[in-house]
Design a protein with these regions (language model features):
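Short helix-coil-helix linker/hinge
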Residues: 1-2, 142
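Short beta-edge/loop segments at beta->alpha junctions of small alpha/beta modules
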Residues: 2-79
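Short gly/ser-rich loop at a beta-strand->alpha-helix junction or flexible surface loop bordering the NTP-binding
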Residues: 50-54, 82-118
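Short, surface-exposed loop/turn motifs that are enriched in glycine and acidic residues
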Residues: 63, 80-84, 138
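Positively charged, aromatic-accented nucleic-acid-binding surfaces
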Residues: 75-79, 91-93, 158
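Short acidic-hydrophobic surface loop/beta-edge motif
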Residues: 118-125
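A short, charged helix-loop
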Residues: 125-132
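Hydrophobic alpha-helical interaction segments
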Residues: 133-215
């Protein structure tokens, strides 16, 4: 009973609860105990099972799984929680978030520590995802430089119009990305990333703004 009370007090209604959350809460308990506890709480309607490994405490509306926002599930499962960062949006979704492209693809693209394959399709609620493994371990400290290097991999920054290039410059300055950061993580990306940074017009402006963003 105390375990159930602890779970109910730890999480808010209509917020995703991952089975991994419960495992971390009770490190001395077996996986079978965790599964049985979640099953019992689901049977008694204290929890609702949203999908495999995802639960939530029902709110006052009683509408079942419709109360759980799939984007909250996606964020917690693949991108971040209150204390950790372990993923980011990729491909067109990353370019769109920074302001380099006006729209994104229908399929949400995510790069995450929680995916070990080169890429696979996943569905959360009615949202289609394509999740791929991270080039290196993502955390709070390196999330922004990894996203910058991903952008440089995706597009030739030399060819960006002024407005889109300025959006990227603002991203660099806002996130305080430094030359040291870029040099440290370049090795985890294809050679084309280093070439785009070190040659031509991209080196001139990127080096200037990266240098001054650390001042």
């Amino acid at each position: 009973m105390k375990a159930i009370e602890r779970i109910l007090s730890e999480f808010k209604p209509d917020e995703p609860i991952l089975v991994e959350d419960i495992i971390r809460m009770f490190p001395d308990r077996s996986r079978q105990w965790v599964d049985n506890t979640l099953s019992n709480m689901t049977s008694s309607k204290q929890l609702i099972r949203y999908s495999t490994g995802v639960y939530f405490i029902p709110g006052t509306t009683g509408r079942g799984s419709s109360n759980l926002n799939p984007y909250k599930v996606i964020e917690k499962k693949y991108i971040k929680d209150e204390n950790h960062v372990y993923g980011y949006y990729g491909d067109e979704w990353l370019l769109w978030k920074i302001g380099i492209v006006p729209r994104h693809s229908d399929v949400m693209m995510i790069v995450s520590n929680h995916e070990k394959s080169r890429g696979r399709k996943v569905k959360v609620g009615k949202v289609d995802l394509y999740v791929s493994k991270a080039p290196t371990e993502i955390n709070k400290e390196n999330q922004w430089v990894l996203q910058l290097l991903e952008v440089i991999r995706l597009v030739d920054v030399n060819e960006l119009p002024d407005m889109e290039r300025n959006q990227l410059v603002n991203f660099i300055l806002d996130q305080k990305i430094t030359i040291t950061d870029v040099r440290q993580y370049c090795e985890y990306f294809p050679d084309v990333v280093s070439k785009r940074i070190l040659t031509g017009y991209v080196y001139d402006w990127l080096h200037f703004y990266l240098k001054h963003s650390s001042l």
